């Protein structure tokens, strides 16, 4: 088959800039073959190389006594005691999910699950953070329904509980939705599997499903902006099969138990290319691949197609040669392909053979270690203008504006499509705050949350970055968990625009400050740039996934308020309305500065709540919508009315940070007040739970009416 001529148009279609192509010529001393061009394109794109973000990612705190393995592997590994580890990561599948919502979201779930089990962990929990355009945009309902069905279809069939996440709507996502998928798994701390190859002449083995043409060029597509050719990109979206993935999980865990594996890597972005290069690079070895041995489900596939296919449910392994028969038998038992497709070599070469031809012969290190790295120009986001006057609102009307918005309405329509109970270890299902999953066969549990407020990040990237981490810290604390570590999913627009790069830099600095102060190191993550359509970028959305530990379920704060319980706020209320949910939903204003985050207060208030958990019946962090929304959500979930005494829009709807709402039995309130005074922590009684009416500063409405609005608004907004 004749390969196309390498032209400037072909180079540009592969996402390579002229200076990058010039660098390729210098590295290999000749024009690349078509397959080599595809390999460089895949390895040097933003999605795989992090060429615009590497400089700043290196500044993040990534270590701590609890960290077994930080960024650089498939997922982060954190010690949870008793010889056990939690392995977790969050990753985006934004571009594919906009083009083909069901498969884009489904394969996002599949990919993140493989990142976890390729390290030897059995997945125990999933979350997803979703950002969509406004409900009345012509594409939004189709995308929402497809994405949610795709997540549910894959996760439910695979058999992992979805225990949390978030859903937001904003016009900035009209042309570019965000689908950030999180997975966590459990492994023995001394049985973690890594991706670095070792040993010369070791067999390189292909595992799992067959290779097709789906997803060819997917990684390159994920590093580009969208324009009016978007429909042409549909073939670059992968197709997933959760039942194959389930078999792959079981086969891999059985294989790992047989002591057959030297190293293993899932085939994700850029498929066979990226997995082989990463294994060789980390092990300082070359890799030779014979593509005739690759299991194929389509006829006449070219070397280019096989190297860049992103067909799902595939792994690459370096095998102990004496274990070939054992390993092959395991994969045959699970009805999965097992094929020796190459070997490790001592030279720094990535050698690709197909038929009797050499299709690629490249210096392997040049594909990863010497990939371009940019110090993009950036400008600091200017300080937000002071917030103008905000009219006083009827508190009930303000609450209705929030609970009637799909961003803050009850999300049962979403999570009822997800299985949150499979594996029978879910202690706290999606709904309010962090999800909690029991560590099977132990007294321990793990808590999971995902958080970011993009409006804050746009107004003030540094404070917005801090706030995403602080809110995750509070959500874990509010269920009684000690925060352990974080994963970041950095979703931004075009980094070649200095103002966008400035948002990224500011957010990284804020995240770094917060994870250091709160002892929640970043152990894994993902960067998704070029989230723009026709030059219009998304809101900067640095999603933080976080994991916390309960050493015993006795530490869990899982109750609901009861009739007559007091409502108290831990922390200081100053009434910050800048960039608040109320301002956006009721007045259509996104103005003012983001709320400042006092990290020392966050730590002190969180430690206070965990130390006094036995005195409270329920807890929630105060964030979007302030006291009024948090108190309503807590009361409504318990089927109770509510009376709040603070008056004024700012006191009820302000979004000051480092605050928690707690429900406390009246006979325990005095002890909690005494503990707060002793700890120097502000604690204010703000009302009472009970009855069948919601009363905010004297304005009232029946709980039943508000509950009906709250529980119907989401489905009505998207025509569900």
UniProtKB/Swiss-Prot annotation:
The keyword Magnesium belongs to this UniProt entry's keyword annotation: yes
Binding residues annotated for Mg(2+) 1, in chain numbering: 91, 526
EC supergroup of this enzyme: ligase
Swiss-Prot/TrEMBL GO biological process terms: 'de novo' IMP biosynthetic process
Reaction(s) this enzyme catalyzes, per UniProt: N(2)-formyl-N(1)-(5-phospho-beta-D-ribosyl)glycinamide + L-glutamine + ATP + H2O = 2-formamido-N(1)-(5-O-phospho-beta-D-ribosyl)acetamidine + L-glutamate + ADP + phosphate + H(+)
Residues binding substrate, per UniProt: 92-95, 114, 238, 310-312, 528
GO molecular function: ATP binding; magnesium ion binding; phosphoribosylformylglycinamidine synthase activity
SUPFAM superfamilies: PurM C-terminal domain-like, PurM N-terminal domain-like
Active-site positions on this chain: 47, 93 (proton acceptor)
Binding site for Mg(2+) 2: 115, 266
Pathway(s) the chain acts in: Purine metabolism; IMP biosynthesis via de novo pathway; 5-amino-1-(5-phospho-D-ribosyl)imidazole from N(2)-formyl-N(1)-(5-phospho-D-ribosyl)glycinamide: step 1/2
Record keywords: ATP-binding, Cytoplasm, Ligase, Magnesium, Metal-binding, Nucleotide-binding, Purine biosynthesis
Localization: Cytoplasm
Protein origin, superkingdom: Bacteria
UniProt-annotated binding residues for ATP: 50, 89, 488, 525
GO CC annotations on file: cytoplasm
Family per similarity comment: Belongs to the FGAMS family.
Designated name of the protein: Phosphoribosylformylglycinamidine synthase subunit PurL
Organism for this UniProt entry: Cereibacter sphaeroides (strain ATCC 17023 / DSM 158 / JCM 6121 / CCUG 31486 / LMG 2827 / NBRC 12203 / NCIMB 8253 / ATH 2.4.1.)
């Amino acid at each position: 088959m004749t390969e196309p001529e390498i032209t400037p148009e072909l180079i540009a279609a592969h996402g390579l800039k002229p200076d990058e192509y010039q660098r390729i010529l210098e590295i290999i001393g000749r024009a690349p073959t078509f397959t080599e061009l595809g390999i460089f394109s895949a390895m040097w794109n933003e999605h795989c190389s992090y060429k615009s973000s590497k400089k700043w990612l290196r500044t993040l705190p990534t270590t701590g006594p609890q960290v077994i393995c930080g960024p650089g592997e498939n997922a982060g590994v954190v010690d949870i005691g008793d010889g056990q580890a939690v392995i977790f990561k969050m990753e985006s599948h934004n571009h594919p999910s906009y083009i083909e919502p069901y498969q884009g979201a489904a394969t996002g779930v599949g990919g993140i699950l493989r990142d976890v089990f390729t390290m030897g962990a059995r997945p125990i929990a999933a979350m997803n953070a979703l950002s969509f355009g406004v409900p009345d945009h012509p594409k939004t309902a189709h995308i929402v329904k497809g994405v949610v069905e795709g997540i549910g279809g894959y996760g439910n069939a695979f058999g992992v509980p979805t225990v949390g996440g978030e859903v937001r709507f904003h016009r900035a996502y009209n042309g570019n939705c965000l689908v950030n998928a999180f997975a966590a798994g459990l492994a023995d701390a001394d049985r973690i599997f890594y991706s670095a190859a070792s040993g010369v002449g070791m067999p390189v083995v292909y595992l799992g499903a067959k290779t097709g043409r789906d997803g060819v060029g997917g990684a390159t597509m994920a590093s580009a902006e969208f324009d009016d050719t978007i429909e042409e990109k549909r073939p670059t979206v992968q197709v997933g099969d959760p039942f194959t993935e389930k078999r792959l999980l079981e086969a891999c865990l059985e294989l790992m138990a047989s002591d057959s594996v030297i190293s293993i890597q899932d085939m994700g972005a850029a498929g066979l290319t990226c997995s082989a290069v990463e294994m060789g690079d980390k092990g300082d070895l070359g890799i030779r691949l014979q593509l005739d041995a690759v299991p194929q489900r389509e006829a006449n596939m070219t070397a280019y197609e096989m190297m860049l296919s992103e067909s799902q449910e595939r792994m690459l392994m370096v095998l102990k040669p004496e274990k070939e028969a054992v390993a092959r038998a395991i994969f045959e038992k699970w009805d999965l392909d097992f094929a020796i497709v190459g070997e490790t070599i001592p030279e720094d070469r990535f050698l690709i053979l197909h038929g009797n031809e050499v299709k690629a012969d490249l210096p392997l290190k040049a594909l990863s270690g010497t990939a371009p790295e940019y110090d993009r120009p950036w400008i600091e986001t200017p300080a937000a203008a002071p917030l103008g006057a905000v009219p006083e609102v009827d508190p009930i009307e303000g609450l209705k504006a929030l609970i009637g918005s799909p961003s803050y309405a009850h999300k049962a329509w979403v999570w009822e499509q997800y299985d949150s109970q499979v594996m029978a270890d879910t202690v706290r299902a999606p709904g309010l705050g962090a999800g909690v999953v029991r560590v099977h066969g132990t007294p321990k549990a793990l808590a999971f949350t995902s958080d970011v407020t993009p409006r804050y990040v746009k107004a003030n990237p540094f404070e917005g970055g801090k706030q995403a981490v602080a809110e995750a810290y509070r959500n874990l604390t509010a269920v009684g968990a000690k925060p352990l570590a974080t994963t970041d999913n950095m979703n931004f627009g075009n980094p070649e625009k200095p103002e966008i790069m400035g948002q990224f830099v500011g957010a990284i600095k804020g995240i770094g400050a917060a994870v250091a102060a709160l002892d929640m190191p970043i152990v894994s993550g993902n960067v998704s740039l070029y989230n723009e359509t026709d030059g219009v970028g998304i809101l900067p959305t640095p999603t933080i996934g976080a994991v916390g530990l309960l050493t015993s379920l006795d530490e869990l704060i899982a109750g609901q308020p009861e009739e007559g319980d007091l409502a108290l706020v831990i922390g200081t209320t100053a009434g910050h309305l800048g960039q608040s949910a109320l301002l956006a939903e009721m007045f259509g204003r996104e103005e003012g500065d983001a709320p400042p985050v006092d990290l020392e207060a966050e730590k002190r208030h969180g430690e206070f709540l965990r130390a006094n958990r036995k005195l409270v019946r329920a807890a929630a962090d105060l964030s979007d919508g302030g006291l009024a929304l948090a108190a309503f959500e807590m009361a409504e979930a318990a089927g109770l009315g509510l009376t709040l005494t603070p008056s004024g829009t700012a006191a009820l709807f302000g979004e000051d940070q480092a605050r928690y709402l707690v429900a406390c039995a009246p006979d325990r309130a005095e002890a909690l007040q005494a503990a707060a005074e002793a700890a120097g922590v502000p604690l204010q009684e703000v009302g009472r739970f009970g009855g069948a009416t919601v009363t905010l500063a004297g304005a009232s409405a029946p709980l039943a009416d508000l509950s009906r609005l709250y529980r119907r608004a989401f489905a009505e907004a998207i025509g569900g």
